[in-house]
């Protein structure tokens, strides 16, 4: 019986020791998120609290510094991943006010819903201002400088294609009402 008891005791002690070391390495806010019973996030140890803990005991400061370093690395990785994935949050946070002129390669396709699009054929050497009333003018369209604006995210995506000049006005809906989220005034794009 003692032969069976000793290996089981060793396995239990090793697993308890591993669980204690693993819980010390996790940032405190992630530990609070993983437990179902806790409803509040625990604050991550700041530099002041680490310095205070350093004065009292060296082991506490070394264990508190590791979660802080890991949480900083995780925050940097999240920033890099959100920048590479192209999320809309940083774009929506930088909305342009109506008074500032913005240089936009023209023409624009403003898509309010899927399948509804309006090609604005504006004379190409032009600067479009946000909040400006724009008209449909049948002039030459250069597909090389065509820019697609996704209305739901305000993303500007350049399209590179062979330079073929055509004259076209594509309208699949009545005149489009368009407003910018930061400026509640409605802009009418009329014929």
Curated annotation (Swiss-Prot):
Top-level lineage group: Eukaryota
Residues in the signal sequence: 1-21
Positions of the UniProt region annotated as Disordered: 52-88
Effect of a null allele: RNAi-mediated knockdown has no visible phenotype.
Keywords in alphabetical order: Phosphoprotein, Secreted, Signal
Post-translational modifications: Phosphorylated.
Residues that span the membrane, as ranges: none
Matching Pfam families: Retinin_C
Keyword tRNA processing assigned: no
Comp. bias intervals (Low complexity): 55-69, 78-88
GO molecular function terms listed in the Swiss-Prot or TrEMBL record: structural constituent of eye lens
Subcellular location: Secreted
GO cellular component, one term: extracellular space
InterPro entries for this protein: Retinin_C
Tissues with expression: Specifically expressed in cornea (at protein level). Detected in retina and cortex.
Name of this protein: Retinin
Source lineage: Eukaryota, Metazoa, Ecdysozoa, Arthropoda, Hexapoda
């Amino acid at each position: 019986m003692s032969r069976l008891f000793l290996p089981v005791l060793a396995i239990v002690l090793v697993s308890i020791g591993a669980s204690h070391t693993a819980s010390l390495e996790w940032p405190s806010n992630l530990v609070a998120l993983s437990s179902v019973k806790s409803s509040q996030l625990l604050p991550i140890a700041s530099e002041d609290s680490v310095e205070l803990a350093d004065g009292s005991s060296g082991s506490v400061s070394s264990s508190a510094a590791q979660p802080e370093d890991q949480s900083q690395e995780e925050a940097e990785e999240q920033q890099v991943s959100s920048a590479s994935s192209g999320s809309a949050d940083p774009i929506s946070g930088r909305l342009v006010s109506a008074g500032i002129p913005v240089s936009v390669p023209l023409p624009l396709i403003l898509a309010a819903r899927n399948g509804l699009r309006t090609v604005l054929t504006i004379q190409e050497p032009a600067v479009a201002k946000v909040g400006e009333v724009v008209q449909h003018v049948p002039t030459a369209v250069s597909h090389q400088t065509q820019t697609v604006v996704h209305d739901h995210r305000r993303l500007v995506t350049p399209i590179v294609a062979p330079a073929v000049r055509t004259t076209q006005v594509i309208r699949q809906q009545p005149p489009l009402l368009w407003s910018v989220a930061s400026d509640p005034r409605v802009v009418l794009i009329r014929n």
